[in-house]
Amino acid sequence: LPARQTLYEYYHDKFGFGAKTGIELGEASGYIYPPDSAEGNEVRYSAMTYGQSMNLTMVQVAAGFSSLVNGGQYYKPTVLVGTIDESGNLKSSENKVIRQTVSGGTSSQMRTMLTTARRSSFLSKSDKSGYEIGGKTGTSEAVVNGAYTQKETIATYIGYGGGKNGAEYVIMVRVAAPGKGINLQGNLHAGPIFTDISNWMIDYMKIA
């Protein structure tokens, strides 16, 4: 139970998995079974360590991942750039730090691991040179009629990019073909989409 409790505290309490983020859009809370519940058994928690047996939204995952690469600070997700007053002046919204998820040292180590994974992939050949790009693929079994199936998979890729100031954006891509019986792969189907958006973001944000 202590090990499951620690994992639950990281996933739910620190990274916000299984809870609404408060973003200004309609959202689901998802769920993570508490370790002291009947469903929160050792088998389920073992599966949770590699991403199964829990229900998360992409906003939750992207927000939690952002804290892993920005020094450990969890920012409240928002779609608001700011507000415009009667004179037409834009007042930028303030970034709100909610909590610390990991230490700065852990965040730095995660970035090293993510950039290493990126550089070892064929995907990095299409990255703009001179920038820090890191990420990780995901290929998961789809759920059909309440059970995992090996006949259909979902492809994901989540990563970040930045320049001399460190991580400046996070992108998560999910590719699925429900009911088509297609085995999608993170590196082949989601990764290239991330690359295209990442290269565009560098130009759009004028990252140095």
What are these regions (language model features)?
Residues 89-97, 188-208:
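Short, gly/Ser/Thr-rich active-site loops of penicillin-recognizing serine hydrolases
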Residues 177-189:
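A short acidic/glycine-rich loop-to-helix N-cap element
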Residues 74-75, 158-160, 182-184, 195-199:
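Glycine-rich loops and low-complexity Gly/Arg-rich segments
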Residues 1-175, 190:
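Beta-lactam-recognizing serine transpeptidase/beta-lactamase-like catalytic domain environment
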Residues 70-74, 119, 180, 199-207:
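A generic secondary-structure boundary signal that marks alpha-helix termini
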